[in-house]
């Protein structure tokens, strides 16, 4: 729609795994939920859920779900599920793969794409964004502790899954590993400095994903987690803040904040900022607000100057668009939006207020920086041009 603004799109989903137990779908709002526990290990970045569940027909199961996004290799997300029937033998059908049925509150930013099974049982989805035509490849490989009695690929509308059937004896534990990777045309290896868009060639992106997914055959969930946990250990050794308090929640709260400060920034890419919701959801459409400089920049300046430089570089990239907007508004300086996304793109949509004035969620900002070595050596144009008049 003409008045919509750029937003951070949700990419195809690899998290969903469907379990059919003796013909009945596992769902916590059906049957009997006997116990549930969810934890996040801040030291390793691994999330775990443990569930005890009884189907409407009476089959009891224990399930343990584990997942993480790798800090060692940003392309990788891995999942592990253990299923144990505790009171009877069962037939278990697992549907797991890649889905493009997800959306941003109803807006689907990716086309349905091309689905293919590669050698070794690797599922691949090739798609691209609707407007900017950014190519995206998603790969996943499943590993099982027991061989399925039946295995076949299933292609549905906007979903590509493998369907695997197992017969488990009472007390037998089946372990499922799902190893996945994402690549896009905006990835740094495909991007020449100064060009935000990267490549629109899907073959290049697919080849990168194919090469990484092929390595999954020689590794597994535990090895990938160990590599990621090693990077987390280095982070905590450098950045941990210890609090003396009678309430242990104070220490937990501090480390939870540090955890998010580590995952919400891409230190090697100044084309992206930090969304107002960080990595917790799609609120504010993934736009960066002045909260970044007000609340987050001091932390990075003190603990990680290279990350702070990246965030400043992100703002610097938006200056050409801000100056153009200033010209459109009859200002001699730059007109910086309250909420910012990609440089040169429209950020904040207009709202018609009851007072009768047309209001935009943006303000002209004018700051003067003195004795700033960063500005002198990197971008003097960041010095704001004071307007000769104000509207």
Predicted regions and their residues:
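Substrate-binding groove/exosite segments of carbohydrate-active enzymes
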Residues: 224-390
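Acidic/polar, glycine-enriched structural segments that form the non-catalytic walls/loops
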Residues: 1-284
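A conserved hydrophobic secondary-structure block that centers on an alpha-helix together
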Residues: 58, 71-72, 384-391
């Amino acid at each position: 729609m003409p008045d919509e603004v750029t937003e951070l799109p949700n990419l195809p989903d690899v998290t969903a795994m469907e379990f059919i137990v003796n013909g009945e779908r596992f769902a916590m709002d059906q049957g009997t939920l006997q116990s549930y526990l969810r934890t996040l290990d801040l030291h390793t970045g691994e999330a775990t859920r443990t569930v005890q569940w009884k189907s409407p027909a009476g089959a009891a199961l224990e399930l343990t779900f584990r997942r993480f996004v790798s800090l060692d290799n940003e392309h990788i997300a891995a999942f592990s599920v253990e299923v144990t029937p505790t009171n009877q033998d069962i037939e278990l059908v697992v549907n797991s793969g890649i889905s493009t049925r997800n959306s941003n509150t109803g807006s689907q930013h990716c086309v349905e794409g091309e689905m293919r099974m590669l050698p070794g049982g690797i599922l691949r989805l090739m798609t691209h964004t609707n407007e900017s035509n950014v190519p995206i490849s998603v790969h996943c490989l499943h590993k099982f502790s027991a061989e399925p009695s039946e295995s076949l690929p299933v292609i549905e509308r906007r979903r590509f899954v493998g369907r695997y059937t197992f017969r488990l004896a009472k007390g037998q534990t089946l372990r499922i590993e799902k190893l996945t990777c994402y690549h896009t045309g905006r990835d740094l290896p495909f991007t020449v400095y100064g060009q935000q868009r990267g490549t629109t060639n899907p073959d290049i992106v697919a080849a990168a994903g194919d090469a990484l997914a092929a390595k999954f055959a020689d590794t597994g969930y535990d090895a990938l987690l160990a590599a990621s946990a090693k990077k987390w250990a280095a982070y905590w050794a450098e950045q941990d803040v210890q609090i003396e308090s009678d309430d242990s929640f104070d220490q937990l709260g501090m480390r939870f904040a540090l955890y998010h400060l580590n995952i919400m920034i891409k230190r090697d890419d100044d084309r992206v900022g930090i969304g107002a919701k960080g990595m917790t959801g799609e609120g504010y459409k993934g736009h960066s607000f002045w909260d970044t400089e007000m609340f987050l920049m001091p932390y990075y300046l003190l603990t990680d100057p290279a990350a702070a430089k990246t965030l400043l570089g992100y703002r610097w990239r938006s200056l050409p668009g801000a100056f153009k907007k200033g010209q459109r508004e009859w200002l001699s300086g730059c007109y910086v939006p309250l909420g910012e996304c990609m440089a040169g793109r429209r950020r904040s949509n207009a709202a018609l207020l009851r007072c009768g004035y047309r209001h935009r969620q943006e303000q002209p900002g004018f700051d003067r920086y003195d004795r700033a070595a960063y500005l002198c050596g990197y971008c003097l144009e960041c010095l704001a041009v004071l307007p000769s008049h104000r509207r």
